[in-house]
Amino acid sequence: MVTSKRRSLGRTCLILIFLIVFFAGPAKGGVAKPYKGLSFHIRYATHFRIEYLENGCKLVTDGIGRKLLLTPRGQIPPEGYKQDQVIEIPVRKVVAKWTTIPPLLKVLGVIDSIVGVTIREKEWHIDEIKKGMEKGRIRYLGGSRETDYERLRDINPDVFFAGEWEKQEKLNELGIPFAVVTEYLERNPLARLEWIKFFAAFYNREHEAENFFKKAVKNVKRLSKKLEGLKNRPRILWGFITERETVYMPRVDTYVARMISMAGGHYVFAGPMQTGSAEITLEEFYSWGKDADIYISPGTLPQYGITSIKKLVAIHPILSDFRSIKRGNVWCFQPWYWESIDKTDDIIEDLAAIFHPGLFPGHRYRYFLKLPER
């Protein structure tokens, strides 16, 4: 009986020691080790990485390969890691460079952490951002091309979700932590959406991100099954014509090209497997696109005064011979398109309904606008 009690007491002591060590963590800056128990699989995205360490620490690689060591607030950063910056999490004040960032933070339930943006109030369609700017809680920090670094310093955010063209030396000089976001370089629309996991790491909202992402992937797979066995894939032209009459077309190895394919279309542009956009002449655009069945302009044409196909042709007469123009099959973005990355699955469904309207009777288009002929 005594022996049994001693064994029970011994086990109890061991459990207590384990709990004390596990939850207390290192009192000083120790060496954090990889902790696979908190790992979340990145299935599609290739432009960021997250390594989960012990004691709530994370080593994040941003869009340009910078290493960011995320550590719980009040905890001494662990030793033994090469990092460009240390950022305390969860972050409370952030600045968003791109319109694609706030919708993902909204999904995570942390959109109120945004205190600065680089898009003017009148251009936003997210109520939380518009109201925040109206009340002065969210500040405008200059245009998307040139950030107002003095205002940024005054805000003193926990992290600036920045673009790859930011003046990094200036940010370092001002002591502003930043993480570079390059979701637009991903080769798959689901990879872009998976950047929600990148942002989640800064807020400890991984489970919310994972659950949301799984639902979106499931929706896209359901759509893919609906489009199985298609005999005819319409030829799709996708390109933005500038005032200089040059055209930007997504290259073959881009999320746009794959999104068209996922929606049951055939992208007419060809070339080497490269990312980004190709800048071509209007004449080259004509050769690629004159026989396309559908033309999608990745812009909000009515904002430029182009409210009909007739007005589009009046500005660019070379388009008059396009099959898509003659058939009245010209589409453009709704103003809120770029703020809808969280609706990627719905956007792909919109495209599928444009390409194959017979499969989607009564579909209401939410992210694309069909230009009237006159």
Feature names for model-found ranges:
Residues 146-156, 280-291:
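Short helices/loops that flank or line small-molecule/ion binding pockets
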Residues 186-215, 224, 297-374:
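Structured C-terminal subdomain patch of bacterial secreted/periplasmic proteins
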Residues 93-108, 208-263:
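Basic- and aromatic-lined ligand-binding clefts that recognize polyanionic substrates
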Residues 253-277, 296-300:
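His/Asp/Glu-enriched short active-site or ligand-binding loop at hydrolase and phosphoryl-transfer sites
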Residues 2, 10, 25-90, 360-374:
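N-terminal hydrophobic or amphipathic helices and topogenic motifs
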Residues 101, 117-128, 168, 181-198, ...:
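Extracytoplasmic ligand-binding site segments that recognize negatively charged/polar headgroups
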Residues 13-22:
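Bacterial N-terminal signal peptides
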Residues 58-155, 159-165:
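A short, structured surface patch at a secondary-structure boundary
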